[in-house]
Design a protein with these regions (language model features):
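Short, acidic loop-to-helix structural element flanking the phosphoryl-transfer center
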Residues: 2-3, 8, 97-126, 134
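A metal-dependent, Asp-based hydrolase signature
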Residues: 53-98, 108, 116
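Active-site neighborhood of HAD-like aspartate-dependent phosphohydrolases
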Residues: 1-52
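Asp-based, Mg2+/Mn2+-dependent phosphohydrolase catalytic module
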Residues: 1-6, 112-115, 131-258
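An amphipathic alpha-helix signature
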Residues: 21, 25, 29, 33, ...
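Hydrophobic residues in well-ordered beta-strands that form the structural core
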Residues: 15-17, 126, 221
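Short, surface-exposed acidic
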Residues: 32-56, 77-87, 91, 158, ...
Length: 258
């Protein structure tokens, strides 16, 4: 297997525990309990039905409009075409409020892994379909994290945010096709100057794993929602529950293993 030269990271669920799931769930609840209450009985929605499993399998990793449509279709909401934009906008307004309020955390194992991949000589990119990804990445001071955790890195500069640290940022761009199409990851690899076969993608969603494999890349699945089986079924080369479990010495040989 060729040595990895590039690492491409999804953001929500990989790097940060974001409020996206909360925003999708709660914005739909608000609609169902107010403006859409007249059609509620025609749907399969209930306050407890929008589970983490539903989010991971049907919504996670998709662009905003596609995610909104997937959720409405899942709950059999009628007249989706005229409702999807309202739902997507309501979700966006809520997620921005939550981000500005600091209602998210960065995963320490992910930040350690990001630093380790760059220290190993790889070029790195963030590649999320979310247009909010940059809001998270700008708020995370990677130099502060490293200092607090005793990490010394030759690639880390004072004052660097996580967004600054990435060599390439393709998050939030408008692509013609969303995941599981590989367009976003192929674009990231191209801008990194790395052939797809020399790149690995770190993903928490089945659609993202499928996109990586469709693009000819290695896929590292991170299971944070008890969905390891879904990631494996999607074709992940390795699935872990913590990125600390990945064998970093093996990475330098182009191997994904524990």
């Amino acid at each position: 297997m060729p040595k990895f030269q590039g690492a491409i990271f999804d953001v929500d669920g990989v790097l940060v525990d974001s409020p996206h799931q909360k925003a999708w769930r709660e914005s739909l609840r608000e609609l169902m309990e107010a403006g859409w209450r007249d059609i509620r009985d025609q749907t399969t929605w209930s306050p407890d039905a929008f589970t983490p499993h539903v989010y991971q399998q049907y919504v996670s990793g998709k662009p905003r409009m596609a995610g909104a449509l997937a959720a409405l279709d899942y709950f059999h909401v009628p007249d989706t075409e005229k409702r999807v934009a309202e739902y997507a906008q309501r979700k966006q307004e809520m997620v921005v409020r939550l981000i500005e309020a600091g209602d998210f955390t960065a995963y320490p194992d992910a930040l350690r892994f990001v630093i380790a991949t760059k220290d190993a000589g790889m070029r790195i990119a963030d590649a999320s379909s979310s247009k909010n990804a940059g809001l998270f990445l700008r708020k995370i001071r990677l130099d502060t994290f490293a200092a607090e955790h005793g990490i010394s890195s030759p690639t880390l500069k004072p004052g660097q945010t996580l967004l600054d640290y990435f060599d390439v940022d393709v998050s939030g761009r408008d692509f013609a096709r969303g995941k599981p199409d590989p367009e976003i990851f192929l674009t990231a690899a191209h801008e990194l100057g790395v052939e797809p076969g020399h790149a690995m993608v770190i993903e928490d969603a089945s659609s993202g794993v499928q996109a990586a494999k469709a693009g000819g890349m290695a896929a590292l699945g991170i299971s944070r929602a008890d969905d390891a089986d879904l990631l494996a079924e999607a074709g992940a080369d390795l699935v872990v529950t913590s990125l600390d479990d990945v064998n970093r010495d093996a990475l330098t040989r182009g191997e994904l293993t524990r």
